[in-house]
Regions:
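Amphipathic alpha-helical scaffolding segments comprising HEAT/armadillo-like alpha-solenoid repeats
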Residues: 1-7, 25-38, 57-69, 88-100, ...
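Non-membrane alpha-helical segments in proteins
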Residues: 42-54, 78-81
């Protein structure tokens, strides 16, 4: 039986999140987690993203792709930060969108989530950001990430 929305709220409300925070959350909870992406509490919306990233189900992965298009910056940051834990194709789809996000914080987390397992197109985007992004700090982060990806 799926956890109710109040049960999920309670479970995700740990002051200091740990693995236990996401324990027992699975495919039956995806719809409730989707509703939490719009919660007025930003921290709860971001924890819903991280909970979705722990679920090995297609509907959870599609919810994460949708989260990457959220109007809420904190939800997009959480989607970017969780991209490195997802299957490569889903990670590529999320990172392709978020590496071009207008918010530097979102781009920073997308850069940091990119790895050698991502597609050539995503890795090439890191190289482009490292060379030409208008934000000096993001260029530096991208340069470090590009170097890290290139190392065996």
């Amino acid at each position: 039986m799926p956890k109710s929305l109040p049960q999920l709220r309670q479970q995700l409300s740990d002051i200091e999140p740990s693995e236990r925070t996401y324990e027992g959350i699975g495919p039956p909870e995806v719809d409730a987690l989707l509703s939490l992406l719009d919660d007025e509490e930003e921290w709860l919306a971001t924890r819903a993203v991280f909970a979705l990233s722990c679920i090995d189900a297609e509907n959870a992965r599609q919810a994460l792709v949708s989260a990457a298009e959220s109007p809420r910056m904190e939800v997009r940051v959480a989607a970017a930060a969780s991209a490195n834990t997802l299957p490569t194709q889903v990670s590529d789809e999320i990172l392709s969108r978020l590496l071009g996000d207008p918010q530097p914080a979102v781009r920073k987390f997308a850069i940091k989530s990119t790895s050698g397992r991502n597609s050539e197109a995503v890795r090439q985007r890191i190289t482009e950001i490292a060379a030409a992004d208008t934000d000096t700090r993001l260029r530096q982060v991208a340069q470090q990430q590009a170097t890290s990806i290139a190392e065996p």
